[in-house]
Swiss-Prot record:
NDH-1 shuttles electrons from NADH, via FMN and iron-sulfur (Fe-S) centers, to quinones in the respiratory chain. The immediate electron acceptor for the enzyme in this species is believed to be ubiquinone. Couples the redox reaction to proton translocation (for every two electrons transferred, four hydrogen ions are translocated across the cytoplasmic membrane), and thus conserves the redox energy in a proton gradient. Keywords: Cell inner membrane, Cell membrane, Membrane, NAD, Quinone, Translocase, Transport, Ubiquinone. SUPFAM superfamilies: HydB/Nqo4-like. InterPro entries: NADH_Q_OxRdtase_suD, NADH_UbQ_OxRdtase_49kDa_CS, NDH1_su_D/H, NiFe-Hase_large. One of its GO terms (molecular function) is NADH:ubiquinone reductase (non-electrogenic) activity. It catalyses: a quinone + NADH + 5 H(+)(in) = a quinol + NAD(+) + 4 H(+)(out). Its main location: membrane. NDH-1 is composed of 14 different subunits. Subunits NuoB, C, D, E, F, and G constitute the peripheral sector of the complex. Belongs to the complex I 49 kDa subunit family. This is NADH-quinone oxidoreductase subunit D.
């Protein structure tokens, strides 16, 4: 009898469903996957090594470029690590602003994930719906930091500035008439908090629209139910965190188990799945968007009632205001020293983690007392998820690789670092 050999093929890195620069070497028996071998490193930028040659403040923008869909959550973990080493107390208002933007970031991430996942499986409409809502949240990013993605808004000791009193409006353009301009600016007449509150009021109906399109869709369920199943014990062994772990039935969320920022004072639920398949991971993330919206409403309510400082008043850690620099020589010296030499951080080692949209994003920082980290290790949540690709895909059809890969919510900025 002739010997039958398995067929080996490349999936990516140019494949549109490869989520960036993933190269999967698949071993196939017909259309059934016998082995899936992820090859990483095509987006490696030596972030951890670069951090050793930059001051603590200069390192902050690198965090945005790791998981470039969950920008401010990465910054939050970095700031928590530096603040632990410094022993600095963050003002309560800054903690609520961080919590607010962490949840805005979570919704941004899950909207992109849902749109891309649906597109990968073959449902195009959802992608267009999701980007409609992302636009409003990107405008919030831009209003507070000047950038739609890489915000660099958090600082060790607080946040760069308070929330603006006026939400920026669309300007007249030859490409839109006066009536359209009026429609676009209808909910931008007040402050940023007014705009976010208006969005939070509308958002649950948008999530209902996504669920109408997908949750009971027969084709969607055929592509996701029973695909890539991981049980609770195995998920823990593989190092899963975030929605990947919770969809397997493990109620582990750092916002509850190890609260940081203002999460201990807020009311929200932790969505948990049952079977640990692709469909459960979809349901958990959709439920998380609803819970994030609940948290946003509570943060907006608190921030309205409680004005106050948004960054520490220690000028050796945080820069003085521009007004002070123009009137005080000492403030100008502090500013110059902080941005030229940086701050000397006490020697020690810490680990700080946040519940990022993809899972536990952690920073392990070692300081030798200088103005630069001695070593910074980044714990990317997507890395152990991708490592389980072989186990999750084995025995499935080649078309299911796309569904399994998309359900992990892979971003290679953080995996390759």
């Amino acid at each position: 009898m002739p010997e039958i050999n398995n067929f080996t093929m490349n999936f990516g890195p140019q494949h549109p469903s490869a989520h960036g620069v993933l190269r999967l070497v698949l071993e196939l028996d017909g259309e059934v996957i016998e082995r899936a071998d992820p090859h990483i490193g095509l987006l490696h930028r030596a972030t951890e090594k670069l951090a050793e040659n930059k001051t603590y403040l200069q390192n902050l923008p690198y965090m945005d470029r790791l998981d470039y869909v969950s920008m401010l959550c990465n910054e939050h973990a970095y700031c928590l690590a530096v603040e632990k080493l410094l022993g600095v107390e963050v003002p309560v208002r800054a903690q609520y602003i961080r919590t607010l933007f962490d949840e805005i970031t979570r919704i941004l991430n899950h909207l992109l994930w849902l749109g891309a996942y649906a597109l990968d499986v073959g449902a195009m409409s959802v992608f267009l719906y999701c980007f409609r809502e992302r636009e409003d949240l990107m405008d919030v990013y831009e209003a507070v930091s000047g950038a739609r993605m890489h915000a660099a808004y958090y600082r060790p000791g607080g946040v760069y500035r308070d929330l603006p009193a006026q939400m920026p409006q669309y300007q007249p353009s030859p490409y839109r008439d006066a009536r359209r301009l009026q429609e676009l600016n209808a909910n931008r007449q007040g402050s940023m908090l007014d705009f976010i509150e208006d969005f939070a009021r509308r958002f649950p109906t948008y999530v209902d629209e996504y669920e109408t399109l997908l949750t009971d869709n027969r084709i969607w369920k055929q592509r996701t139910v029973g695909i890539g199943v991981v049980g609770p014990e195995r998920a823990i062994q593989l190092g899963f965190t975030g929605p990947m772990l919770r969809s397997s039935g493990v109620a582990w969320d750092l916002r509850r188990t190890q609260p940081y920022a203002a999460y201990a004072d807020l009311d929200f639920d932790i969505p948990v799945g049952k079977t640990g398949d692709c469909y459960d991971r979809y349901l958990v993330r959709v439920a998380e968007m609803r819970q994030s919206n609940r948290i946003i409403v509570q943060c907006v309510d608190w921030l309205r009632k409680n004005p106050g400082p948004v960054i520490t008043d220690d000028f050796k850690i945080a820069a003085p205001s521009r007004e002070e620099m123009k009137t005080s020589m000492e403030a100008l010296i502090h500013h110059f020293k902080l941005f030229s030499e940086g701050m000397a951080v006490p020697a020690g080692e810490v680990y700080a983690a946040v519940e990022a949209p993809k899972g536990e994003f952690g920073i392990y920082m070692i300081s030798d007392g200088a103005n630069k980290p001695y070593r910074m290790k980044i714990r990317a949540p997507g890395f152990p998820h991708l490592a389980a690709m072989d186990e999750m895909a084995r025995g499935h059809m080649i078309a299911d690789v796309v569904a399994i890969l998309s359900t992990m919510d892979i971003v290679f900025g953080e995996i390759d670092r």
